[in-house]
Swiss-Prot record:
Protein function: This reaction introduces a second double bond into the aromatic ring system.
Source organism superkingdom: Archaea
PANTHER family recorded: CHORISMATE SYNTHASE
UniProt-recorded name of the protein: Chorismate synthase
Binding locations of FMN: 124-126, 284, 299-303, 326
Cofactor note: Reduced FMN (FMNH(2)).
UniProt family annotation: Belongs to the chorismate synthase family.
Residue ranges the record marks as coiled coil: none
Entry GO terms, CC: cytosol
Lineage of the organism: Archaea, Thermoproteota, Thermoprotei, Thermoproteales, Thermoproteaceae
Any Gene Ontology biological process: chorismate biosynthetic process
Chain residues that bind NADP(+): 46
InterPro entries per UniProt: Chorismate_synth, Chorismate_synth_AroC_sf, Chorismate_synthase_CS
């Protein structure tokens, strides 16, 4: 499926080397301020062109809102957004036709779609397709703001280099002022070195990111199959390259005694709340009003400039390929922005499901 969400619903389309990437967003109330610049601003956060090996394509994002917005306000009808693909070089992929790249979705797409899948630039499985998710996230973040909530994330590991510093949510947001959003300067310096080392080797690196959502009201989510944690996890694994997820303190929590792991319940400002937040803002699949936080790990980019063993599917014979085209040394920075976006989409959907944001009448100015 290419559609996600129930009340705030997005449908993405497009391939890496097609004419455009795009998304149709349904469920947005009338009266929300929205411009192409709002979407472009979010898309530019995923570019990282100041580190060329992270984005050799470095494509200026040409955004068009085709429907659902008039004079800077949403109309309550479906919003269609396209992002045009301009810097496409498909010649690199001619020699890879029917020769799936190890570690890439090429092989799985062949098994499912046969010779009809578009392998150029990774086609529908390319990280480029997350631009559509980020566009949807730009709208979702505006929905969250109506409820006083926001989402931000940072890189916690890259190429085996992990952060080693205490930090707050404000530190996470401020980290975006650095070359990469990393709260630990020493770790950042080592990560930048690792990026250049991988590029020099013709190889790639993976890593992990952490996303926070603060100001999320209590009561979002359902007891069983609509758990907020399950929905966010499903959304997270829709981002290409995602391989693992830790919620709250995650595996560290699993190693504690129950008496240590439990967050005490207290009263603050006349309301019950958690004294600590080891669980990451969710109990029983339902938000409790404390910050949501979780980590997702991404594998190294499959495309590398090293000989890789595969099969020529046209001949059904073993062969070796060596990728010569443009590739991102790491997908982690771009994946972080996409993960922020799809988290915002999921939370916006739950706000509408709970009736905290109404889609059946215009927003009050």
């Amino acid at each position: 499926m290419n559609t996600f969400g129930r009340e705030f619903r997005i449908t993405t389309f497009g391939e890496s080397h097609g004419k455009a990437i795009g998304v149709v967003i349904d469920g947005v109330p009338a009266g929300l301020e929205l411009t192409e610049e709002d979407i472009k601003r979010e898309l530019e956060r995923r570019m990282f062109c100041h580190i060329p090996v992270l984005n050799p394509r470095c494509e200026p994002e040409e955004v068009e809102i085709l429907s659902g917005v008039k004079e800077g306000y949403t109309q309550g009808t479906p919003i269609a957004v396209v992002i045009w693909n301009r810097r496409v070089i498909s010649s690199y992929y001619e020699e890879l036709w029917m020769k799936p790249r190890p570690g890439h979705a090429d092989f799985a797409y062949y098994l499912k779609y046969g010779r009809y899948y578009d392998h150029r630039g990774g086609g529908r499985a390319s990280g480029r397709t997350t631009a559509a998710v980020v566009a949807a996230g730009a709208v979702a973040k505006k929905i969250l703001a109506l409820a006083g909530a926001e989402v931000a994330g940072h890189i916690v590991e890259l190429g085996g280099v992990e952060i080693n510093a205490s930090y707050t949510y404000e530190d996470v947001k401020k980290s975006w002022e650095r070359p990469l959003p990393v709260v630990d300067q020493q770790a950042l310096d080592k990560m930048l070195e690792k990026i250049q080392e991988a590029a020099a080797r013709g190889d790639s690196i993976g890593g992990g990111v952490e996303v926070w959502a603060v100001g999320v009201p209590p009561g979002l989510g359902e007891p069983h199959f609509g758990k907020i944690k399950a929905d966010i996890a499903a959304a997270a694994f829709s981002i290409p390259g995602a391989i693992a997820l830790d919620w709250g303190m995650g595996r560290a929590l699993a190693k504690m005694w129950g008496s240590e792991a439990n967050d005490p319940i207290t009263v603050a400002n006349g309301r019950p709340t958690l004294a600590t937040n080891k669980i990451g803002g969710v109990l029983g699949g339902i938000t409790v009003g404390t910050p949501i936080y979780f980590r997702v790990w991404f594998k190294p980019t499959p495309s590398v400039r090293k000989p890789q063993q595969t099969v020529d599917l046209a001949k059904m014979e073993p062969t070796t390929i060596e990728f010569k085209g443009r590739y991102d040394v790491s997908i982690v920075p771009k994946a972080l922005v996409a993960l922020e976006a799809i988290t915002a989409v999921t939370l916006a959907d739950h706000l509408l499901r709970a009736g905290l944001i109404r889609r059946d009448k215009p927003l009050e100015k």
